[in-house]
From Swiss-Prot:
F-type ATPases have 2 components, CF(1) - the catalytic core - and CF(0) - the membrane proton channel. CF(1) has five subunits: alpha(3), beta(3), gamma(1), delta(1), epsilon(1). CF(0) has three main subunits: a(1), b(2) and c(9-12). The alpha and beta chains form an alternating ring which encloses part of the gamma chain. CF(1) is attached to CF(0) by a central stalk formed by the gamma and epsilon chains, while a peripheral stalk is formed by the delta and b chains. This is ATP synthase subunit beta. It is an enzyme of class 7 (translocase). The keyword Repeat does not apply. Pfam families: ATP-synt_ab, ATP-synt_ab_N, ATP-synt_VA_C. GO terms for cellular component: plasma membrane; proton-transporting ATP synthase complex. Coiled coil: none annotated. Its EC number is 7.1.2.2. Produces ATP from ADP in the presence of a proton gradient across the membrane. The catalytic sites are hosted primarily by the beta subunits. It is a peripheral membrane protein. It comes from Bacillus anthracis. The keyword Flavoprotein does not apply. Belongs to the ATPase alpha/beta chains family.
Amino acid sequence: MNKGRVTQIMGPVVDVKFDGGKLPEIYNALTVKQSNENGTSINLTFEVALHLGDDTVRTVAMSSTDGLVRGTEVEDTGKAISVPVGDATLGRVFNVLGDAIDLDGEVPADVRRDPIHRQAPAFEELSTKVEILETGIKVVDLLAPYIKGGKIGLFGGAGVGKTVLIQELINNIAQEHGGISVFAGVGERTREGNDLYHEMSDSGVIKKTAMVFGQMNEPPGARQRVALTGLTMAEHFRDEQGQDVLLFIDNIFRFTQAGSEVSALLGRMPSAVGYQPTLATEMGQLQERITSTNKGSITSIQAVYVPADDYTDPAPATTFAHLDATTNLERRLTQMGIYPAVDPLASTSRALSPEIVGEEHYEVARQVQQTLQRYKELQDIIAILGMDELSEEDKLVVHRARRIQFFLSQNFHVAEQFTGQKGSYVPVKETVRGFKEILEGKYDDLPEDAFRLVGGIEEVIENAKKMMA
């Protein structure tokens, strides 16, 4: 075994000197297992990041370096961090190193373990088939539909509902889809992960889900690598079992943020806004592995925090380039009480074309967007001069646009405990029919509030009857 000693500790970054000139390779895992003087045991894993010369390597710790001292002996494992894969991971909760952190005991020693670093699938192995993934959420299915085996980003600032939307998608898709899911909690709140675990346990979805967490309280090394741990588990189900896997990542921005912290500690020159100079490379290495091959598919749904609601920030801007569909959450809509607060004009999908979704769906979606865009243009006139100054045609546009805007809202199953109202799953056909009839003017006589937070168009009619009674 190749052994070295700790020569310098800078928070989560540790320098290790190896004698004899045999240095561990980049990405190799190094371990420390010993007790210090006051009797507390230290069990640490580092990942090699740089070769500094003078037989010294600079490493990043995967857990807190409290209690570590210079001179501590370190062992080279000779391979990268490896995590359990396969059916043994289902129903379990892991940390970045693949150690079980639930109450169901250790993972058996004979379970296969795969390294978290690997190449993306070769060009000729990739699949190009396009199939729509129904979510049951009206605004998504109509205006920015998701692709099976595609990459989807949920963009939004703090507190606009990204995690709630991810939880609803887990509820709707994982239960309907019935396949295997992997959830990676990257640098988010431990409470949310705990809530999600208990919700999934209650609904039974946990039996087909592997969960990996490296939350806000973890050092940056763990937050940076935990997405790769989850991805490695998902890749095994895709490549070895030919499964269609769902991969949820909450939050991909924290992956970038952790990379930025590590980069500064490793002594790299910062780039724009203080981010790491390797931002695009790191994001590309992760995203290119999340793909569909001839064997199976990985459909990934990633929450992306937008710092200070600024979409030009390098972190969200770099993520945009990799996605097939984007769902943009807007603070202005939360203030209007429209949930999910998805911006129907800013959200995009490459699947919204007549060849993929069909002519009728495409036409209805485009008409909805045109109506909302015209309403947006008229808002300045309304604010200055009032509704009375509009032409009859524009008054009708505003009238219908407000109904469309409210009808894009919906009650969620995961929010039942807050709203006291049952969540709704709306099939795509129902969604298209409902919006088509609103555009045709069938419901011009119904009150606006009847359209708020409902499922299908039948619920609107019921609400209107109650209001008019």
